[in-house]
Regions:
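N-terminal membrane topogenic signal
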Residues: 1-13, 67-69
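Residue-level detector of alpha-helix boundaries and kinks
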Residues: 3, 34, 92-93, 161
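Alpha-helical transmembrane segments of multi-pass inner-membrane proteins
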Residues: 7-16, 20-23, 41-53, 74-86, ...
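Short, hydrophobic transmembrane alpha-helix segments
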Residues: 23-37, 56-62
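Juxtamembrane membrane-water interface segments of multi-pass membrane proteins
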Residues: 59-65, 182-187
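Interfacial helix-loop-helix linkers and transmembrane-helix boundary segments
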Residues: 60-66, 91, 114-121
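Short coil/turn segments at secondary-structure boundaries
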Residues: 62-69, 95, 99
Length: 229
């Protein structure tokens, strides 16, 4: 019973966290950016509380084993802390947010270590959000929906095409990886195909070269790992 309750709580918090791109109810003047940030911070706080409570109630619980990938968030944080201009301290809130994202990385690693069954569900939900964003952007390009910026037609649920294109760029390799793993045409297959197809159509209109490069490199890496496997 306790395991089912824990699984349910982790599922709910993970679903809310992955829904962050759509957080923005207009309650703040800068809701498109601020409310998304607050949403992620709030879910991270709840996730931290649940994880710490689980470790406190069960001290013998096995922690997630470290891999070489887990060194990257700490290395990135260290690089940012060393290069940050403390004399003028321009964006302290972003420095704090980056630190919170590093904590969130290790929280998610522990959650997926305890409940590996959630990996498939979170992956599918993440791809579904990418598909929704791609359809949203396509509707904006066709003039069927309003954009969130007066100078850009394509923004999705974001404020401008930059973060929107970046979000599509991180959903594409995940969708490709799941698509390549499918041995038959099932729901994950069609969901991944839909995400890839719509994102490829919309992404060039974002005019984000960094997103294009990210898509090419990440998808090539995923395909190379698939072929080597």
């Amino acid at each position: 019973m306790k395991e089912l309750l824990k699984l349910g709580v982790y599922t709910l918090l993970g679903t809310l966290l992955l829904s962050a791109p759509f957080a923005g109810l207009g309650m703040l003047s800068t809701h498109l950016v601020t409310e998304k940030t607050f949403w992620i911070q709030l879910i991270t706080l709840f996730l931290s509380a649940v994880s710490l409570q689980g470790l406190w109630l069960n001290p013998s619980k096995e922690l997630c084993p470290w891999t070489y990938v887990d060194i990257l968030p700490l290395s990135l944080l260290g690089l940012i802390l060393l290069s940050y201009p403390y004399s003028i301290h321009p964006e302290p809130e972003k420095l704090l947010f980056i630190g919170q994202m590093v904590v969130l990385w290790y929280l998610l690693r522990q959650v997926l270590h305890e409940c590996p069954v959630l990996i498939g569900y979170f992956s599918m939900f993440f791809i579904a959000t990418g598909l929704i964003e791609a359809i949203w952007g396509f509707r904006q390009l066709q003039g069927w929906a309003y954009s969130n910026h007066s100078l850009f037609r394509l923004t999705g649920s974001f404020f401008n095409p930059g973060p929107y294109s970046g979000y599509l760029a991180i959903t594409l390799p995940v969708a490709l990886g799941i698509l390549l793993e499918q041995s038959k045409r099932n729901m994950p297959y069609y969901l991944s195909m839909g995400c890839i197809g719509t994102a490829i159509v919309v992404l060039p209109a974002g005019m984000s070269r960094s997103a294009w490069i990210a898509v090419v490199v990440s998808c090539a890496w995923v395909y190379a790992l698939y072929r080597l496997d």
